UniProtKB/Swiss-Prot annotation:
It comes from the Bacteria. One of its GO terms (molecular function) is (3R)-hydroxyacyl-[acyl-carrier-protein] dehydratase activity. Its EC number is 4.2.1.59. It is found in: Cytoplasm. Keywords: Cytoplasm, Lipid A biosynthesis, Lipid biosynthesis, Lipid metabolism, Lyase. SUPFAM superfamilies: Thioesterase/thiol ester dehydrase-isomerase. The keyword Cell cycle does not apply. This is 3-hydroxyacyl-[acyl-carrier-protein] dehydratase FabZ. Involved in unsaturated fatty acids biosynthesis. Catalyzes the dehydration of short chain beta-hydroxyacyl-ACPs and long chain saturated and unsaturated beta-hydroxyacyl-ACPs. One of its GO terms (cellular component) is cytoplasm.
Length: 144
């Protein structure tokens, strides 16, 4: 079942807030299975002040975090995980393939490939204009 979530609905599912909420909207959500979200990267992002002042580039770790937040929406939408928090359990096979700069629209896609109990794995891909900017296998654990 596809769902659209605006920023207020996202904030009801995950606990992240400014300046660390890195997802603006969710355009596709299959609870417990997959999600697609977007981050509009603007020149006003706090991290561009120091990364890098003369050539602003979104830090790769924040792209991974944005992917994880979309993954958290997917897993925490499952009835048994509502109201809980998804924590990183690990990051495997992370690759950064394209710079993300002010003006880019970051498409954040995750497919949850395995869930066992409160732990799981997701295949995550971030793209800009259809080109892969980053990808990784994300491991997570759901806690209180």
């Amino acid at each position: 079942m596809e769902k659209f979530l605006d920023i207020n609905e996202i904030k009801k599912i995950i606990p992240h807030r400014y300046p660390f909420l890195l997802v603006d909207k969710i355009t596709e959500l299959e609870e417990g299975k997959s999600a697609v979200g977007y981050k509009n990267v603007t020149a006003n992002e706090y991290f561009f002040n120091g990364h890098f002042p003369e050539e602003p580039v979104m830090p790769g770790v924040l792209i991974i975090e944005a992917l994880a937040q979309v993954g958290a929406v997917a897993i925490l939408s499952k009835e048994e995980f509502k109201g809980k928090i998804a924590y990183f359990g690990g990051i495997n096979k992370a690759k950064f393939r394209k710079k993300v700069v002010p003006g880019d629209v970051l498409k954040l896609s995750i497919d949850l490939t395995k869930i066992k109990g409160v732990a799981g794995v997701g295949k995550a891909v971030a793209t800009v204009d259809g080109k892969v900017a980053a990808e990784a296998e994300l491991l997570f654990v759901v806690g209180k």
